[in-house]
Each structure stands twice: as C-alpha cells, then as structure tokens.
C-alpha cells in the first residue's frame, strides 16, 4: 500500500493554473499533490552569440528552490556564489526537454527562457517543472503569434514528465517524497505526446532492477504521462 493510498499507476492530483504572474509572456503554477512549482516563460528578441545569424532560435531554462520549499531550510545558492550540481543538472534536463518540443528554425532568432521555481517540494520537482514549463512555453508562443512575432506555431507537441520507481517490490508511478526516499529504484521519464521518449534517467538506489521491472516502469510512465498531457491540454483549452 502506498502512503497516499494511490494505486501503482495513479498520479497525484494535478492542477495547472495559467497566467499566474502578471508580466511573463507565459506563466503557470503547477501542482503535483504537495509539490508546487511556478514556471514563467520570458521572450527575448535575441539569441546566444554562437547562434547569431543562423536563423534559429533557442529555448533554455533555469531551476531553483525557495529556501523553505523542503522540510528544513536550505541556504539560497546565491549566498554561496554558485549553483549546485543538482540544480545545473535539473535545469539542463528541463531545457533539453523543451527544445525537443520546438522547431528552433521556425522560432527565428528569438529566445525563450523558462524559469522554474519550486515553492514547495514533496518529490518529483523536476518532472513537475517540465510539465508546467511546457504549458508556460505554449502560452508564451501563443503570445508571440498574437503579437506578430511569429507567423506559425513552432511547437511540435506537448511534453511532460513523471517519476516512476520500485517501492516495496512494486513498480509505481509519480513518487512523493516518502516513496522516493525509500525506493529501491528511482527513474524520471520525459516524453512527447506522440509517445516518443526524450529522456530516461534511472538509478538503482538500493537494489539493481531487472529488465522486466524496467519495462514495467516505462509502461507506467507512458500511462502516467498520457494522463498528465490530458491535464495540459485541458488547462490550455480554458
């Protein structure tokens, strides 16, 4: 039995609130149970120096956590003068996931930066960030189309992510903190809405996992991501 009483394949209650902040071209509060992340997408009419003159745009991301997003306070990374390795890994993952969903040539020489700020963490912050960032990105692109900065939509489709793992000998989907901290195996999966995978990150935290367990986790991830993408579509239709 899972701590929350959920079935193995059941994701947490998901809420996606659009237009959450006033100034960004796209902004979302995404909630996966008690994990809450603000995702804002900002448009700039320039690209990194190495892309200038190439007729392509760029999508990048930054990630951070409020000091008391977790059970005990963490110092702000700015206080130490550098980002931690975990932070850099996660923001690169978010950026790669979003770029896979965008035709960068169709974006033109414009850049979209998506900031993901975790205000409360209960497991799955990177997967919630990707899910919310995709909606914020879609809103920013729609804003660009409406303002004449784009003639066509460069998004190839929705992208979403979910965690899966082996907990008490069973493959489960969308781990909360109590499960994540006690899991034998932890895996994050990022997929497009057509079912193609963007990234699979899996680690045997306690015990190695079998080929069959890998297949079980991937099947749960696909089912969970399908459910999450329906939530994204419903939010964007409002």
From Swiss-Prot:
Pfam families: RNase_PH, RNase_PH_C. One of its GO terms (biological process) is tRNA processing. Its EC number is 2.7.7.56. Keywords: Nucleotidyltransferase, RNA-binding, rRNA processing, Transferase, tRNA processing, tRNA-binding. It is an enzyme of class 2 (transferase). SUPFAM superfamilies: Ribonuclease PH domain 2-like (SSF55666), Ribosomal protein S5 domain 2-like (SSF54211). It catalyses: tRNA(n+1) + phosphate = tRNA(n) + a ribonucleoside 5'-diphosphate. Belongs to the RNase PH family. This is Ribonuclease PH.
